Amino acid sequence: MAPPAAAAAVTLGGKGAALTPAAVYALSHGLADPAIDCCASPLVRVADAVAALSCEAARGDVAAFDVPTSGDGLSAKDEADVAADVKMLLFGSKLVGAAGGADAASFTKVPTVNGIFREAVRALHARVRIELNAPVKLGKRDAVQTGEGKEEALVALATQLARPVQAMLKLSVARARLCVARIDDAELRKKLTDGVEIDDLKGMLGKVTIDSDAVSVLRGVYNSLLKFRDILAWEAAVAMAVIEMDSSIEKPQACEENEAGSSTENPHASGEKPKGDKKSKKKKTLGKGTSAVLMLLRDLVTNGKEVLSVNSALLAEWGTELSLLFDPKCPRLVSLVDKVKEIVETNEVRRLPKIPKGTRDFGKEQMAIREHAFSIITGVFKMHGAVSLDTPVFELRETLMGKYGEDSKLIYDLADQGGELCSLRYDLTVPFARYVAMNNISSLKRYQIAKVYRRDNPSKGRYREFYQCDFDIAGVYETMEPDFEVIKVLTELLDQLDIGTYEIKLNHRKLLDGMLEICGVPPEKFRTVCSSIDKLDKQTFEQVKKELVDEKGISNETADKIGDLVKTRGPPLEVLLELRKEGSKFMGNAGSVTALNELEILFKALDKANAIGKIVFDLSLARGLDYYTGVIYEAVFKGTTQVGSIAAGGRYDNLVGMFSGKQVPAVGVSLGIERVFAIMEQQEMEKNQIRATETEVLVSIIGKDLILAAELVSELWNAGIKAEFKLTTRIQNHLKYATQSGIPWMVLVGESEISSGKVKLKNLAASQEEEVDRTEFAQVLKQKLRNP
């Protein structure tokens, strides 16, 4: 049985809406864009509903519909939305599963293929809507020229739709054949299998993509859509027939009217089985969404009549009826699309909630690790006399603009609320500089631990919302005095966190500028060239050179000179001697000489503080932020711990002055704590030592005596002991909870202990127990915890 013939050309208007003059002109002059859009848009919802019906009929594999929608950036939005919508339609189904097998791809491809189709339709719809709403003077042909560029854009979008349509069509045929395979009647099965031939479609896509005439291209895409619509109708008819003929499936029934005239839903319609019907209890139910779709389609093709038997002629009739239903000029198509949308949106509450891309939740174990890390970090900061500071999570947009160079595009702008243009903070350094300027502060050593936000592409270990731990010193000091302390703080942080072998790459902004001047880079291009050099930790020099030459306008000769110099790296004092030796080009550059003199002081101080062993003098380090003016540095892990930069900072003498007439020099470092969390979490998991709580004692009442529990646990709290209590008659539940929570001690109190005036202390790690007087147990425990 072949699919029904394509219906006649569609018209615009949807729910009876009038055509705009531009639409009339477009249609009267053979521009098929409106017809394509009008035909394709409703098929987005219809295709999902039909795919869900086929999943039911063929017992499809729906494992692929568990598409991740978290903030990891690993899934496309439309793909995830299709998967979620089909899952909502199938909610409650006892037919679908994860059967797998050779034909599983016919169902597992649904989210991807339907998602791409949805994306292409939306792009075309947006463009067509703009063009059709443009003002047009009818009757004056020259006045309605859309312009060659606009026509090419429409053709390009329509052509982009052709491939998804072709993929949808082939997938629809494949699913329909899987449904046919479920039919027991061999003769009917053969007729249906042999009836679909799509050989005539093989050249369709090629013709669409090579046609040079715009109208021919658009008509080709439109014809593909008509063919897809017919195939989709045939698939729906086959799926309905398979469900109808399968006696193991509980058939949904429409609502019935009671004597009062109100409608009551038949329990079958929602997948529920009537009580007492033993036979029906054995039948499998459809999903609640697919049940509703099936009832609507069945009512259309049968006019409410009972289906006594299914044959090829009846299927042909159903296919024709459904093809007409899927035609945009059919009034009932609106009802079908609205019904599918209603099912999905009504069941929205059943969707698993999700978080935005690039964000994460911290569970109890992660919070324990985070608090431990913060306590170490805060301890180091306070040891150096720093005070805590907090600033707003959003700033005036003008405060942040012009401070981050090319990274300014990553700033999150907020909607205007009350006349102020605001943005989420990109880092903690600029807000600190603004605070110093606003409050006319001349000297301050501060730390801040807070979240920052960047509109970056999320990936593994890279977030849009993340913590930074900042330590900054503002004020006028002796040369390299605060720079030394900030770098020393960084080494202490990484040593105490004990998360791997690291090195701190260090350079000087004036030395970097001198290097670029020596190589022949124009001063106005220093910053943009630095942003390219800054990528050398992720890209080869050949890739960076291509960017310098092709995008930044640097000559090949200049780029090669830069490449020779940025290779210089090694132990600080050795590289310093190399750069200052006789004949060095750096010694002929005033800025470079100043930088090298400052670095000599810094390196000698770090050497005396036993911290220079972690430092690498690296001329390829070029922090991309515009506000750095002196020493710059970046901490990275060595060896197998590949998480990129974990800390960075430098001197920024002019940043405070951007907010006031007074310049206050400053230097600081920022620790990217998210990557530290990941390493610490992995270490704790390997040791199996992650504890969400710090509870030391569990008071276990073998019974339900809350009064006794309150008395005992309060004594422990008053003694400064971290304790919890639990009421249950089963001793195993107490032991299980204490073991899973990592609680080292238990106070066991049962009937015998109550009558004897004693309690039982249990050391879980040593598997030892002892009885002590009820009046002394708190002090005994305090002593044992103090001296384990």
From Swiss-Prot:
Gene3D superfamilies attached to this UniProt entry: Anticodon-binding domain, Bira Bifunctional Protein, Domain 2, Fumarase/aspartase (Central domain)
Keywords of the record: Aminoacyl-tRNA synthetase, ATP-binding, Ligase, Nucleotide-binding, Protein biosynthesis
Record-listed E.C. numbers: 6.1.1.21
UniProt xrefs under InterPro entries: aa-tRNA-synth_II, aa-tRNA-synth_II/BPL/LPL, Anticodon-bd, Anticodon-bd_dom_sf, Aromatic_Lyase, His-tRNA-ligase, HisRS-like_core, HisRS_anticodon
Region (Disordered): 252-286
Single GO term (MF): RNA binding
Regions crossing the membrane: none
Presence of the UniProt keyword Protein biosynthesis in the record: yes
GO cellular component, as recorded: cytosol; mitochondrion
Record-stated family: Belongs to the class-II aminoacyl-tRNA synthetase family.
PANTHER family (UniProt xref): HISTIDINE--TRNA LIGASE (PTHR11476:SF7), HISTIDYL-TRNA SYNTHETASE (PTHR11476)
Record's subunit section: Homodimer.
NCBIfam families for the chain: hisS (TIGR00442)
Protein name (database record): Histidine--tRNA ligase, cytoplasmic
